[in-house]
Design a protein with these regions (language model features):
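Short, solvent-exposed coil/turn elements at secondary-structure transition points
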Residues: 49, 128, 155, 219-221, ...
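Von Willebrand factor type A / integrin I
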Residues: 1-33, 42, 170-174, 188-297
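Von Willebrand factor
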Residues: 141-176, 188-194, 220-221
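A generic local structural motif
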Residues: 66-68, 164-167, 200-202
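Short, electropositive alpha-helical surface patch
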Residues: 132-147, 269, 296-297
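An amphipathic, basic-hydrophobic helix/alpha-beta surface used to engage anionic
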Residues: 1-135, 177-182, 187-188, 194, ...
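Conserved phosphate-coordination/catalytic loops
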Residues: 100, 155-162, 258-261
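Short, contiguous clusters of charged residues that form electrostatic/catalytic patches at enzyme active sites
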Residues: 104, 108, 159-166, 265, ...
């Protein structure tokens, strides 16, 4: 797209998503995410009735009497958006491609963040980390994020959610609120293969323990069901492989639908094990209602 077309598209998304963030989501965001984080404030001498789990043993040893750590609510949050830029985002059969809805959802979350005076950053990932935008405040920063959401083209086309989560773990030392925005079409995300080399614990488990992690699945109707249109040449958007498929065969359509259902059940298993909040949004659905459901979980 030309620079002028990009500018017009940025402006269109800004008007739509900034209004949603300010008028609808700001209050929900504040009540859901503010106050979840606790930051170290000071140490003071232990008093009867204090929680012994808060004892600072290093200070206690130096002072030769017990001291405890005092924590207070963090007034400022950092929000990280993990945005899938793999080849499968360029698929869409109804009203828009998945990448378009991902951009709007991410922009809405970004504007909600700055409306509450918090910082927002972005990790673009395929089967590697494609781009990292460090968290900052301010409208100009969000507009920069929107431009990247609309125009960024990745080097690779595969998907590795593990890489994105591991980067988040390494890059964000303090607890943050993170949204994984993807079609979640990565088998490693739902299998035991995706583990940390250090601990042997699945990376998604480590990430959800360290950070407040939510999953937003963006998918197309045809991701879940195959139409009956006869012979169809199907291309895998991530591997580039092309095969002829006879969609008139009910067995083919049923196998396709079952593969989708199996994937969704595997995702539910991940959510159950990690306690992650999550929502699925189809590209022809209203994402506003879906985000409201997510904020109220």
């Amino acid at each position: 797209m030309t620079s002028e077309e990009l500018l017009q598209k940025v402006r269109k998304i800004e008007i739509k998503t900034h209004g949603l963030s300010r008028n609808i989501f700001a209050g929900e965001y504040h009540s859901q995410f503010k106050g979840r984080g606790m930051a170290f404030s000071e140490v003071r001498e232990y008093q009867p009735g204090d929680d012994v789990r808060s004892i600072d043993w290093n200070v206690t040893a130096r002072m030769n009497r017990p001291y405890i750590k005092i924590y207070e609510e963090e007034r400022e949050l950092t929000v990280m958006l993990l945005v899938d830029v793999s080849g499968s985002r360029n698929f869409g059969t109804v009203s828009q491609m998945k990448r378009d809805m991902m951009a709007e959802v991410a922009a809405t979350l970004a504007f909600s963040t700055i409306e509450n005076n918090d910082k927002v950053g972005v990790i673009f990932f395929s089967d590697k980390i494609e781009k990292f935008i460090p968290p900052k405040k301010g409208k100009s920063h969000v507009l920069h994020i929107i431009r990247e959401l609309l125009s960024f083209e990745p080097e690779n086309s595969g998907t590795d959610i593990n890489a994105a989560l591991q980067f988040l773990i390494n890059a964000q030392k303090r607890r943050c609120t993170a949204f994984l925005i993807s079609d979640l079409m990565d088998p490693k995300f739902t299998s035991g293969i995706m583990v940390s080399r250090k601990t042997g614990v699945p990376t998604v488990v480590i990430a959800s323990r360290k950070h407040d992690l939510s999953a937003i699945q963006i998918y197309d109707r045809r991701d879940a069901e195959m139409p009956n249109v006869g012979l169809l040449k199907v291309r895998d958007p991530e591997t580039g492989a092309r095969v002829w498929t006879d969609t008139a065969l009910s067995s083919v359509r049923e196998a396709y639908a079952k593969a989708w259902q199996d994937q969704q059940e595997a995702l539910e298993n991940v959510y159950t094990k990690t306690g992650m909040n999550h929502v699925s949004i189809r590209t022809d659905e209203d994402y506003v209602k879906a985000l409201m459901r997510l904020f109220k979980q």
